Amino acid sequence: MKTCKEKALEWNVSPRSVNDMCKKGRIQGAIKEKGSWLIPDDSPKPMDGRVSNGKYIKKNMVAKAEVKPLPIGISDYVRAQEEYYYVDKTLLIKEFLDQKPLVSLFTRSRRFGKTLNMDMLRVFFEISDKNTSKYFADKNIWQCGEEYRSHQGKYPVIFLTFKDVKFDTWDATIDKIRGLLQEEYGRHQELLNSDKLSQYEKKYFTKIISATANEVELTSSLERLSKMLASHYDKAPVIIIDEYDTPIQEGYSKDFYDEIIGFMRNFFSGAFKDNKNLSYGFLTGILRIAQESIFGGLNNLTVNSVMDEEYDSFFGFTESEVKAMLSYYGVSDKEEELKDWYDGYLFGSEEIYNPWSVINYISKGCLPQAYWVNTGKNEILDDVLRVATDDITERLYDLLQGERVVARIDQNVVYRSLAEDPADIYSLLLVAGYLKTPKKELQADGSYLCEVSIPNREIAAVYKSEILSHFLQTGAITRTTANKIAESLYANDYKKLQSAIGEYMDKSISFFDGGAEGFYHGLMLGLIALMDNQYKIKSNRESGDGRFDVSLIPREKRYPGIILELKWKEKLSDVELEKWSNEALKQIGELRYDSEMKEDGITEILKFGIAFSGKKVCVRTE
């Protein structure tokens, strides 16, 4: 038997935590002698911190010594499938070989397994001195027959990932690309000793590997390396480019878009357009850049996006994969919670879970929160939101209320066009992972007319932190003011509320001058950003008659219900404005806005009548 202190050292937790687990009966075999807990030597650490009894080990759960950790941040295929819990996606290889497109582009949002899948393709196809078939012998692809196994280890491979090419200047960006090419050429130093390469080719190879090649020479580096590999191995290589659009996003945001587009156009053209030294090509990214902007004339490019049926189950986790994972870790009882938070994406016709969030959720003791929000910031989003119209602002509010919005989705987005046409925001939000398409119809021009909605609770939280923060910072409503409004509502302090709204109006002159609707949009977004966790927010706008009511229905009975009746009219005196606010307050009672809350058993209901005229505001409460 061991003491709590000894077990704490073994489990890397505090003695107090072990003592608490013993008290709650979560450690099997623990006994209390003379005021201290004693624990069996072989007692395993409980995995789920919220399981409340000693029978926490599920029937199908493997013993602790056999449980593999989850691959958080692991994009190395060999390591992932050897050392970690690996969700088998090798049938992607079969689907590809059944169709054999010459060049494939996969577009998915960040953290959906793109890099891991591309490294899997590299390991599968690449010629190696080692026996790499062992990394696939127990995988699904190996059971598909010799016609697929015969491709394993038979091709030279060029592999580049641009996922970390994130710099503020073009000079720094091209230096990083030069370094990546130096590393990739370094993986193929056998070419320097090849009797099938000319001295001229070896001289060029040396310039790349010594990082002395200029920008023009770098543009032909993929094409020339593919030719050298094909000559040496008598087999055209496979070229894999992961996260191809990361430096393009940076170029757009940091004002070197022309330089990066010019470079990439030549770089990819040499590699993929009419290259007889290419067996197959793969690219991944977030956005599908219009072909005329970077893949000009590349007629052999097959694009697979979230709208397509092909490959729909290979990026992200399917429902059956998630159920198997939950069972493996003994937390099948968390299925509904996990589904509510991280399910809801639709890739083609397949329902998909966010893989990054799922593995973080399980590894963090099944604690539901927005894990994906911290994985990167899409600066393009800020650029689009900066020119968002009132209509788009209102639709974002509707989305946050759980409604569906009809939008045109154009997958052929050119970065530079985003700011010119704010309606493209929906296309961007979809491919970036912020929306799903429950319903879609293909149009004659190749775009889709879709019903879009927020996939799950995590993305609702992401909207508030990433998207709504833009409005909180750029004219709709300041975060400080939004906090004051929320606090004054909770406290039923009409004077403080009047002051906060007045401050908001003073600080958002241009936004407010766009019309009264703009004021309400900003106010509603601010309320949602700060109060949606505690309240379901419903609104009823009567266009044309100058009124707008808002009901904040508490999600838990311990919070008061809140009803706002807002009215506006031009050119009112202070006396008239006060009368108008009292009329608004009176209307709440006359129209029985509180009936729904009372029926739900909410006894404390705060009511506010708010009137404004120009830059003046008056608030009254019961």
For each feature predicted by the language model, list its residue ranges.
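A short, Lys/Arg-enriched interface patch at domain edges and termini
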Residues: D41-V62
